[in-house]
């Protein structure tokens, strides 16, 4: 088989199963409205849960820092790219979340890959929830450690896997809020089981940080859990981009030596770090609390209005509200039907989700109004098959 045939066969396989991914060019993709091809849609696909990507205070912080620092960091943080803005943000994050240290990464994918590949050795074992993010599972597969997956949120299965003999160390991997199902992990029980077996716990709280808990401290704080490794990302609740790993002093020093994604990458622009500090200030303020309360009310309104006879609604109380439709083609048709009625929603299909669970992944944000939710429900019930 030639290179070209390999590429063509892979693309053909995606096309015939209605799983070929496509990008859409948009003029505006965050906030209440999405603008594409000159048309405005109610946006139910954005991760900008608190609407902070459009916040004037955060925009101004980025602009002012770009004037001071320029638009790039100029290098790896180990060379010349670790500015006072980066240092300030790390210290603010650590204080906010109650950890000795925080380390910044350019993305959540990079943070998860870096931590797992740096820590795990040949005789170690990773025990991960089956629905963990692709960045976590890919890192686990690429590491020299053994990967075992437990049934989603099944703590008994997790316990059985941890009980089997392991020569090295064990790392339990889960998420705070799951990106495709929108549900939460039983973190307190998972932490108890991990500690009973002397395993460390890594929690990726990409979809919980900023959005839940006191001052937006996230799912772990809400559940009274403090994992050895907490990964938070800034493209959702913070409305910007990037990520951080919260950990102990010694683990931070270790990652600075052995996390290749950190050592060999240009750090985020200082202006981005300063914008993130401004975003954190909003999240922790009374305004941030009001934004979280509004989002929670919108989620409740949506769930109360969905016709369960037409759609399978998962037990999700986060901003992520997936409607399971099963068939790939039906999911695509529903997404297109919603767009025709002015609502932008995304059809999620395998391999992102298991076969037979294609869905509309609807995301609600603080930028929406109650009338937007009512319009979405009206269109959904009219488009049901």
UniProtKB/Swiss-Prot annotation:
<dbReference type="GO" id="GO:0030170">
    <property type="term" value="F:pyridoxal phosphate binding"/>
</dbReference>
<keyword id="KW-0663">Pyridoxal phosphate</keyword>
<dbReference type="InterPro" id="IPR004723">
    <property type="entry name" value="AONS_Archaea/Proteobacteria"/>
</dbReference>
<comment type="similarity">
    <text>Belongs to the class-II pyridoxal-phosphate-dependent aminotransferase family. BioF subfamily.</text>
</comment>
<feature type="binding site">
    <location>
        <position position="133"/>
    </location>
    <ligand>
        <name>substrate</name>
    </ligand>
</feature>
<feature type="binding site">
    <location>
        <position position="207"/>
    </location>
    <ligand>
        <name>pyridoxal 5'-phosphate</name>
    </ligand>
</feature>
<keyword id="KW-0808">Transferase</keyword>
<feature type="modified residue" description="N6-(pyridoxal phosphate)lysine">
    <location>
        <position position="236"/>
    </location>
</feature>
<dbReference type="GO" id="GO:0009102">
    <property type="term" value="P:biotin biosynthetic process"/>
</dbReference>
<dbReference type="GO" id="GO:0008710">
    <property type="term" value="F:8-amino-7-oxononanoate synthase activity"/>
</dbReference>
<dbReference type="InterPro" id="IPR004839">
    <property type="entry name" value="Aminotransferase_I/II_large"/>
</dbReference>
<dbReference type="InterPro" id="IPR015422">
    <property type="entry name" value="PyrdxlP-dep_Trfase_small"/>
</dbReference>
<dbReference type="Pfam" id="PF00155">
    <property type="entry name" value="Aminotran_1_2"/>
</dbReference>
<dbReference type="InterPro" id="IPR001917">
    <property type="entry name" value="Aminotrans_II_pyridoxalP_BS"/>
</dbReference>
<feature type="binding site">
    <location>
        <position position="352"/>
    </location>
    <ligand>
        <name>substrate</name>
    </ligand>
</feature>
<feature type="binding site">
    <location>
        <begin position="108"/>
        <end position="109"/>
    </location>
    <ligand>
        <name>pyridoxal 5'-phosphate</name>
    </ligand>
</feature>
<feature type="binding site">
    <location>
        <position position="179"/>
    </location>
    <ligand>
        <name>pyridoxal 5'-phosphate</name>
    </ligand>
</feature>
<dbReference type="InterPro" id="IPR015424">
    <property type="entry name" value="PyrdxlP-dep_Trfase"/>
</dbReference>
<dbReference type="InterPro" id="IPR022834">
    <property type="entry name" value="AONS_Proteobacteria"/>
</dbReference>
<comment type="pathway">
    <text>Cofactor biosynthesis; biotin biosynthesis.</text>
</comment>
<dbReference type="InterPro" id="IPR015421">
    <property type="entry name" value="PyrdxlP-dep_Trfase_major"/>
</dbReference>
<dbReference type="InterPro" id="IPR050087">
    <property type="entry name" value="AON_synthase_class-II"/>
</dbReference>
<feature type="binding site">
    <location>
        <position position="21"/>
    </location>
    <ligand>
        <name>substrate</name>
    </ligand>
</feature>
<keyword id="KW-0093">Biotin biosynthesis</keyword>
<comment type="function">
    <text>Catalyzes the decarboxylative condensation of pimeloyl-[acyl-carrier protein] and L-alanine to produce 8-amino-7-oxononanoate (AON), [acyl-carrier protein], and carbon dioxide.</text>
</comment>
<comment type="subunit">
    <text>Homodimer.</text>
</comment>
<protein>
    <recommendedName>
        <fullName>8-amino-7-oxononanoate synthase</fullName>
        <ecNumber>2.3.1.47</ecNumber>
    </recommendedName>
</protein>
<feature type="binding site">
    <location>
        <position position="233"/>
    </location>
    <ligand>
        <name>pyridoxal 5'-phosphate</name>
    </ligand>
</feature>
